[in-house]
Amino acid sequence: MKGFDVWAHSPSAVTGQWHALAEHVRSTARLARSFAVSFGAADLAWALGLVHDAGKCSAEWQSKLQRVAATGERVGIDHKRVGALLVRDRALAAAMAVSGHHGGLGRVRSLAALTPEPGDRETLRRFLAVVPEASALADGPSLLPEAWGESPMVGEMGVRMVFSALVDADHLDTAAHAHGLAAPRVAPPADMGGLVRRFEANRVALLAERGDGREVSDVDRVRAALYEDVVRRAVGEPGVYRLPAPTGSGKTMTAAGFALHHAAEHGKARVVVAVPFTTITQQNAGVYRDLLGDEVVLEHHSNAELDDRRLRLAAENWDSPFVVTTTVQLFDSLFGRRPARSRKLHRLANAVVVLDEVQALPMSLLVPILDALKVLTRHFGTTVLLASATQPSFEHLRVWDSLDIKPLVDAPVELFTRLRRVRYEWQVDPQPTLAQIAEQVARERQALVIVNTVGQARRLFRMVAEQAPAAEVVHLSTRMCPRHRETALTRIRGLLDDGEPVLVVSTQLIEAGVDVDFPVVFRALAPAESLQQAAGRANREGRLPGLGRVVVFDASDAPVPRFYRAGVSKTLGIFGPGRDPDDPALLDRYYRSLYTGLNVDEAERGAVIQASRMELDFEAVADGPERDGGGGKRDRGLAFRMIDEDPVSVIVTEYDPEARAAELVERLRTGSGPLGAVLRELRGHMVSLPRAVATAPHVRALCKPVIAGHEDLWEWQGGYDVHVGVDEEAIGEDTVW
C-alpha cells in the first residue's frame, strides 16, 4: 500500500483533493512539536502527532471513508487505539492524548487496560508501510520530559499541555486541507518589543487626551508614579507577582504595562489577561485595543463578536499576542478534558497571565487553581500577576506556603493612604430598614446604592423613585438585557459628567469594573472585598474638595444571602468604625480568618479534584467522580466548574428599539441563516436566569422554546419593565446580580 493510497480525510470542497494520511500525520507532528518546544516536550509531541491517526490505516476505516466521502457523514470507526498502543510503553500517560484526541482525555487506568483487537496488527503494518519513521517509536527510553517525574501534578499538567498541542495541531492541519491552504495557518511570533513601544506611545497620547483642559490631580500623580515603579520591576525573574493596586489607581493599564514589559524582557510569547466578569472583559479589551490595535488584542468570552474567521480561529486556540478573556474560560480550559476546551491550553506555556480581580476566584476551587498556577510557573515558563485592590492572602494556604510571591508595591499601606478618597460610615447597629435607606438616598443629589440581590434592588429602586419623584432614578441588574444595561449606563455617565442629579440602585454588577464616580455610595453589608469594590465607585477621580462617603448598611428587611454569610461574619468581626476594609493589614487578617473558617485547605471539592488529578483521572476532574454504585453517574457537585449555577438564557424581544430581535428569533426557529451569527447578534437581548428559577412552573409558563430540543434557550413572553427588566412578578428575589 503506497502513501497516496491511504487517506486521512475526504476531498477538500475547495481543491477536490483527498488528504493523504502520511502527509497529515507528518504535518500534525511537526506542528505539535513546534507548540511543545516552549514546555520541553517537543519529541513527545512529535511522536504523538505522528501516530495519532494510525488506526485510519485499517481496511475497514478506509472503505467506510470512501463510502461516506460524498455525504459528509462521519466514519464512526475507532482509529485511536492503534496509535495509543504503539507509544504507550514510551509515552505512558501521555498516550492518552492519542486515545482522547477526539473524545477527550479519560483516565490512565483505561489506557493501561487497553488491549489490541483483531486486525490491529495488520493495521499497524499498513501504517508503518506509509509512515516508516514511526517504527522507531515502539522501543526505547521514555519520551516524557524528565521534569514531569518530579511530582504527579507536574506530569498531569504535562499530559494536558501535550494533549493541547496535539489537538490544536490536528485541527489546524485538517482545517488547512478543508480550506485548500498550502499549510496550516499559524500566526508568526509576536514582536513583544514592538508592542511595548506601541503601548507606551499610545498610553502617553491617551493620558494627554484624557487630561486635556483640566488640572493634573493628586490621583493622576499617584497613578503615574505607580505605573513607572511597577514597570521598572518587569525585569525581575519569571514567577508569581502581586499588584495590590487600590481601586481607581489605574490598575488596568499598569498590569498590562508590567505584563508587556516582562514579556519583552524574558521572551514570553503572549499576555493573557483574565477577569471574573464579562463586563470588565469588554471594558478592558476596549482600553487595550486603543493602546495596541484591533489586530493585536483578542477578546474571548461568551459575548464577544467574532465575525471574522481569523478571529474565530484565534479564539479557539488563543493564537494571538494579547488575549483578554474571563477566568471562567481560562480555568475551565485548564481543568477541562475536551479538545475544544483544551486546544488553547498550550498557549499558557511561556506566557504572562494576569489575573485581574483575583479575589473573585471561588473558594471551593482555590486549592486546585493555585496548585495548577504553581506548576505552570515552576515548570512551564508562565509568569502570573495577581492584580486586585483586595489582595487575597494565598500564601497562608498550604498549597502556596512555599511559593515566592514577588510584591510590585513595597509600601502598600502608604499607597492606599495616598489614594484614600472616601470615609466609611457604618449603619449596622441598630439596623435601618430599606425604607429608611431610601429616604437617605432620596436626599442626595447624586448617589449610588448597591444591594445584594435582584429582589432587593427592585424594591429599593421603587422606594427611592417614590421618595424622589423629581429625580432621575436608574436601576441596574442582570435582569435587564445587555442592550438595556448599556443604555442605562450611558445615561448614568452622561448625567454624572454633566453634573446633573442622578440616583442609581444596582446589584453588585456595578462593582465589576464599571467606571463611574459618585460623591456617595451606599452599600448593603457584604464581604469586605465587595465593600472595597463599592468604595471604588465613590470619589474615584479624587475631584471632591473632601472625602467621598461610603455608607455600609445592614437593613433589617434585606437579609444577607446565604452564600455571603461566612464572609459577612468575618467582616463584622474585623472591620467597622475606624477599621476600614481598605486597610491591607486588616485585609490580610480577614482572609486568613476566612480561609480557616471555611477550611479551604481541606475543603471536600478541592480535595476530591486534587485526588483525581493525582490519579490522572481527567474525567473525574472535569465531570465529577463516579457515584457509589457506578452506573456511569457522576457527582457534578465535585467537578471543576467555575460556575455552579447552570443558567438558562431567555431572549427578550420586547426591549428592541429597532424591532429586530423578534425577526432573529424567528430565523432561529426556522433554521434560516447561520446559527452562530444569529446567536451572536441576539446576545444583547439575552437575560440569563438560574435554572432553578427558569424551571419554576410559573416562570416556565412564560418561556417559549426557540430551538427544538434545546433546553438552555427560550423566548421570554412575560413582562419586561422599562426600568427593571424581566418582570419581577415571575422571578424569585434572592439571586445575586
Predicted regions and their residues:
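Conserved Walker A/P-loop ATP-binding site and its immediately adjacent core
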Residues: 254, 259-261, 267-291, 304, ...
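Conserved RecA-like helicase motor core of SF1/SF2 enzymes
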Residues: 67-80, 475-482, 486-489, 500-561
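Accessory nucleic-acid engagement/destabilization modules that flank
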Residues: 1-207
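Inter-Walker segment of RecA-like/P-loop motor cores
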Residues: 293-335
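Conserved strand-helix element at the start of the C-terminal RecA-like helicase core
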Residues: 270-281, 440-465, 475
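Interdomain hinge/linker at the junction between the two RecA-like core domains of SF2 helicases
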Residues: 389-442
